[in-house]
Amino acid sequence: MAFLTEPEPRRGAALAVRPGIRRVVAANRGPMTYHGTNTYLIDAPGGLIVLDPGPDDPAHVAAVLAAAGPVARILLSHTHHDHLGAAPALRAATGAPVYAWHDPAVPEFVPDVRLRDGDVVDGWQAVFTPGHAADHLCFAGPDGVLFSADHVMSWSSSVVSPPCGVMTDYFASLRRLLARDDRLYLPGHGPPLPDPLPFVQDLLAHRQAREYAIVATLGAAPLTTKALTDSLYSQVDERLRRAAERNVLAHLLKLRDEKRAADNGEGWVVA
């Protein structure tokens, strides 16, 4: 499928995405994060919102604080550290409460305000989209804008890494977005995604094709997750091989739950 690219962003700058929304890209570039985590600054009726503080990086925190001015609220899409890490420092510096879904599996983080599906924060509605993470939220706002975070990214497909990531949930959350009519996605990494629904359809088809390939490869002789990954992702960049193996495991667990595959103790076989 076709992905989007963009030039290396200017570090520390708050660049306009659309009226009332700016983006500061953290300096955590990598094979899993593209140019870095997107931290969004949103002008809202109740004051400025910081969405996804980003990694625990003093330079990034300083850039966000310099660009933001007074902060009314901090929203968090999910509790992966490249999005959560700077939240304590931003909260301490601004006094702004942190709003997030609360996942008991991450005991070191408790938000000030626990969000549930459908909650609205100053015009932005929480849309529960587990899959990439068990506590993942998108946020839907005015004019068809959806902060899609790491559920849908324009530059790459998402990693679904068990146990926090669940492929069955990921499929369901993609279908949930297909039932909506959002017109612009703002992802957790990479450039904005206009006209997103065909892209989401392609993502779902890509994952379904990968699942069909796994089923076609399985037989009576057991195969390890690594062996399946080596077969299905033979051309993958070595830096992404671990992520590919986690995705394959997530597919296998989904197939196991559907009674289409089984782990016989030596490896995976067709059920």
Where do the model's predicted regions map?
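Residue-level signal for the nucleotide or nucleotide-sugar donor/cofactor binding architecture
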Residues: 85, 165, 243
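Conserved beta-strand hairpin/beta-sheet module of binuclear metal-dependent hydrolase folds
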Residues: 7-66, 138-154
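Histidine-centered divalent metal-coordination motifs
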Residues: 77-83, 132, 189, 251
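Glycine/proline-rich low-complexity segments that form flexible loops, beta-turns, and polyproline
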Residues: 1-7, 20, 106-109, 132
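Residue-level signal for inorganic ion chemistry
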Residues: 20, 64, 189, 214, ...
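C-terminal regulatory/interaction regions
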Residues: 2-3, 216-271
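Metallo-beta-lactamase
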Residues: 47-50, 55-57, 125-128, 133-213, ...
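Active-site HxH/HxHxD metal-binding segment of metal-dependent hydrolases
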Residues: 28-30, 34-35, 53-123, 154
